């Protein structure tokens, strides 16, 4: 069995905890992917994980495949400046005005790690604020009350993070203006930065109040700290200008990843020119990497952005998410379950609970066991949902109306089986 072999060479048998699917007898094994579909050892599945949001056009999109193939024919790494990376960065800058300059790295984790280091170097301060349930990758600065796989596995604060590092990270309830303002005023002139998911997509999906986002900007400006928007998930998914465009708030620094790599490894941190000019070689804040601005990732990312600029991919993906959100609530209600679905743009998540979901505590109060049972039944009927209530579902331009209706029919069967299992 492949999983047994995998456990012999990988911790837990996987290379990222979210792939373990701890509620199943064994993880899914991928065989391939195309359009909205994953091909696995359990058959073809309609994919709503979409590589945790990295894929927005659909799997193996022809335009992306062609761009990557052409780049491979020219060579795949030079460790030199290229015309393509400049054109790519100019495209991003045109759509995200807060990013005046940027550094292209290799992952969301690298992006947020460097953004925090840069904020500390620029302000000459050490303390940062992050929010309960926000996930900013797997580095020491931010692995405190984190989301995503850390929440799924019940280890939001990782072992191995020194207490001296934790002491420099203040954790505040998400979407709580009063708690945030109080904490900023307590820290005052020691605060280097506030890092936040402007739409929290790593603790389920939590859409904050506009007043909360506005307060982040006002309070950081008041004390001379930097505001970092972690848009690794939302960048170029919520729209060409991301969540900051949706809320109309301009952060000092932004991190990007996922969509802008077209399914290949990438991360970006960028923002105000005066802040970014602190990055080596123009300044004293160090960042370097053999694979920075990798030509293949840049080629894929540029192809994705050019497709998104046409508008139609967003229209299809967003309409799919809207239809699924409404359809799932209706199906769950007919089956006798209290379910609320949160949705924005091409992201959605469902929770087994009554009432709204506005905070991480609301997510924790949802019935995780029911979600995991539904997830397993959905696979049985050909649908792959996000593997935990602490993750988010994503649609793509390949999730056409027919695919959505097929999905809803499959989920109706899954909810009917769930009802019989739990005795409703």
UniProtKB/Swiss-Prot annotation:
SUPFAM superfamilies in the cross-refs: PLP-dependent transferases (SSF53383)
One GO CC term on file: cytoplasm
InterPro entries: 4pyrrol_synth_GluAld_NH2Trfase, Aminotrans_3, Aminotrans_3_PPA_site, PyrdxlP-dep_Trfase, PyrdxlP-dep_Trfase_major, PyrdxlP-dep_Trfase_small
Enzyme class: isomerase
Superkingdom: Archaea
The keyword Protein biosynthesis is annotated on this UniProt entry: no
UniProt-recorded name of the protein: Glutamate-1-semialdehyde 2,1-aminomutase
Provenance organism: Pyrobaculum islandicum (strain DSM 4184 / JCM 9189 / GEO3)
